[in-house]
């Protein structure tokens, strides 16, 4: 029988690898895991309670908000904010920063997308939570402000995501590899199921919404055409796999190899995905697993942000596939 390792125990064991660790980051990650359990409880009951459908409001991005978006957002803020470990938080659903009720001793910043892919929830397609953790830039939590949120992705101390699908899986990194945990509802715990995840150097799948093809720039069209061409030497053609839920598409490609593409378009010249709580955390995870993430011209983790809800194009996944995407976007092919 395989040894069962809970997520809490794994956090503690990882902490021992760092002689300077105080245990604070371990507590933060466990808070996130606890919040994920609360969201999971409602996601699996979504068809039985009145949290499907639209909430009748729009978020700061101008997107229609689902009832479950609001529920997940509130649960995460309340579950994590009450412990005083975060001085500041930022969410896709809130225009400005969020000051937790007990932030006097907080030394960290949490940025998150409470329910990525929520447009799929009504039809029972996988959705997820994405999160990113930074240290405060100063020592005084009472002086924390938006600038503490606007750090480069390379400054992240932890990042992760939770997928609510046929099973519930939490994947995270603290910069020392990538680990995945599957939720066991019979004991109410996340158990280690994917240790030291590494992504293939080259994949065989590409994920993109080709329904927007007419909006793509020529460089993106040429890249997609390249992936479809037959060439046994380079393993082409690739197959399309696109769910429409960023975290689910990314997770599949992370495990099996492939590239996820959400490019700049004629309509959205700066891209559409959010840098701070979608692209950055996934880029951190991807690089830790041996992959690559870029906006087409610059490494995602090197982008200097100017606003909380900043958007970016995203090419992320297997290293060789992303390098070729960069070459097309930069006119080298």
UniProtKB/Swiss-Prot annotation:
InterPro entries: FBPase_C_dom, FBPase_class-1, FBPase_N, FBPtase. Binds 2 magnesium ions per subunit. Mg(2+) 2 binds at residues 113, 116, 278. GO terms for cellular component: cytosol. It catalyses: beta-D-fructose 1,6-bisphosphate + H2O = beta-D-fructose 6-phosphate + phosphate. Its EC number is 3.1.3.11. Keywords: Calvin cycle, Carbohydrate metabolism, Cytoplasm, Hydrolase, Magnesium, Metal-binding. Pfam families: FBPase (PF00316), FBPase_C (PF18913). GO terms for molecular function: fructose 1,6-bisphosphate 1-phosphatase activity; magnesium ion binding. Homotetramer. This is Fructose-1,6-bisphosphatase class 1. The lineage of its organism: Bacteria, Pseudomonadati, Chlorobiota, Chlorobiia, Chlorobiales.
């Amino acid at each position: 029988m395989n040894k069962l390792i809970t997520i809490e125990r794994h956090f503690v064991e990882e902490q021992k690898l760092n002689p300077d660790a105080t245990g604070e980051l371990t507590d933060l990650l466990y808070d996130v895991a606890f919040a994920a359990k609360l969201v999971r409880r409602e996601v699996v009951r979504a068809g039985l309670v009145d949290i499907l459908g639209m909430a009748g409001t729009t978020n700061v991005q101008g997107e229609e908000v689902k009832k479950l978006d609001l529920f997940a957002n509130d649960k995460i803020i309340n579950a994590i904010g009450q412990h005083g470990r975060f001085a500041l938080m930022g969410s896709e659903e809130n225009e400005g920063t969020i000051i937790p009720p007990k932030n006097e001793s907080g030394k960290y910043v949490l940025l998150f997308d409470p329910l990525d892919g929520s447009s799929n929830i009504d039809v029972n397609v996988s959705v997820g939570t994405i999160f990113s953790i930074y240290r405060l830039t100063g020592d005084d939590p009472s002086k924390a402000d938006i600038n503490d949120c606007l750090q480069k992705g390379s400054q992240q101390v932890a990042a992760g995501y939770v997928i609510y699908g046929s099973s519930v899986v939490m994947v995270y990194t603290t910069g020392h590899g990538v680990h995945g945990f599957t939720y066991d509802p019979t004991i109410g715990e996340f158990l280690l199921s994917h240790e030291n995840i590494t992504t293939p150097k080259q994949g065989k799948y590409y994920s993109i919404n080709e329904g927007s093809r007419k909006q793509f720039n020529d460089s993106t069209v040429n890249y997609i055409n390249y992936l479809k061409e037959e060439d046994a030497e380079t393993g082409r053609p690739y197959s399309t796999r696109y769910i429409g839920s960023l975290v689910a598409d990314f997770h599949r490609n992370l495990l099996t190899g492939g590239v996820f593409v959400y490019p700049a378009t004629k309509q959205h010249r700066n891209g559409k995905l959010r840098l701070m709580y979608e692209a950055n955390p996934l880029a951190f995870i991807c690089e830790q697993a041996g992959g690559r993430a870029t906006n087409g011209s610059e490494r995602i983790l090197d982008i200097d942000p100017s606003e909380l809800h900043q958007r970016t194009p995203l090419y992320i996944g297997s290293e060789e596939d992303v390098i070729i995407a960069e070459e097309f976007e930069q006119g080298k092919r």
